[in-house]
Amino acid sequence: MLREAPSLEYEKWLELHAGEAVSGVYALFESDDCVFVGMGNDAVTALQEVRKTLGADVSLKIEEHDGDGVMSLVFGSWLDEASPGGVRPRVNAERAAARAAARGF
């Protein structure tokens, strides 16, 4: 699901969302390596904790979703990934890119 999501600058994203309860599925990358994947209703705190253990070259991919929809988003994406030609990952990536552009990323 996250492979087509836009790569965001971690520090800028965190500054933008400081103090918010962001829900979603997210991953941190160090250089080009995925070093952390998580999901839940407190992405900001989780990402702050993991970030402390990483080097300087960190980027973030996130598919945000409201509240209880996180699990549906993950489960739906797994179903789409299992069937070639599934549209949800592409639609999610487009939605994430539009949100990122609206926020100045």
Predicted ranges, named:
Residues 55:
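A surface-exposed, charged beta-strand/loop segment in the N-terminal or early-internal portion
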Residues 84-94:
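Coupling/hinge elements of helicase-like and P-loop NTPase modules
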